[in-house]
Design a protein with these regions (language model features):
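Flexible, low-complexity linker and terminal segments
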Residues: 2-185
Length: 185
């Protein structure tokens, strides 16, 4: 129940690749906490944006159960989804949304390491830089350079500990990017 933005770069966005067939038997769908009841009085009290310890509210789909009204708004809203400018409600809703980040951080995708685990030089990249990173490491290792690479498959939530640990072990760090503004660096 979180918006997803897929960040890519031009090379990946305009490329085609042949990949092995996905094993769909390994895919599971977790629909999360769903709200459904046959009791219409309970359904009338459904709160789409209920404040929870995880930040994730129980979901009900429109027309899923008799008597459930799914209400939401793009501006600040209360637990029932109605517009509000109440300061306490605003603070509670912001905190609720931020708690969702804790769950995301538990499932962070760890960077892929290429080359030596500990090296004098570390190359860091994301997106379409993976091929260039690996090629650079191979060339530099063949020339006798102590070098390794770290490729990030996601940049948020950022894998802080993994990247910081890799940087601490290196004497020199280069961030290799395929953009003009150094978005990662």
């Amino acid at each position: 129940q979180t918006p997803v933005i897929v960040m890519t770069d031009h090379a990946l966005a305009t490329s085609y690749f042949t990949v092995n067939k996905f094993d769909l038997s390994r895919v599971s769908i977790d629909r999360g906490d769903l709200f459904c009841t046959k009791d219409t009085s309970e359904a009338a009290g459904y709160r789409r944006h209920k404040v929870t310890s995880s930040g994730v509210s129980p979901r009900a789909f429109p027309l899923q159960c008799e008597g459930i009204l799914v209400c939401t708004d793009s501006d600040e809203h209360d637990e029932a989804g109605h517009l509000t400018e109440d300061a306490e409600t605003r603070v509670a809703m912001v905190r609720k949304r931020m708690r969702k980040c804790d769950g995301l951080k538990r499932d962070v995708l760890q960077p892929v390491r290429y080359g030596a685990e500990a090296s004098d030089t570390l190359l860091i990249g994301w997106g379409s830089t993976m091929g260039a990173l690996c090629e650079a490491v191979d060339i530099m290792v063949a020339q006798g350079t102590s070098v390794g690479a770290l490729h990030l498959g996601q940049v948020w939530p950022f894998p802080v500990e993994t990247v910081a640990d890799a940087i601490r072990k290196a004497r020199r760090v280069f961030v290799v990017e395929n953009n003009a503004t150094g978005q990662l660096a």
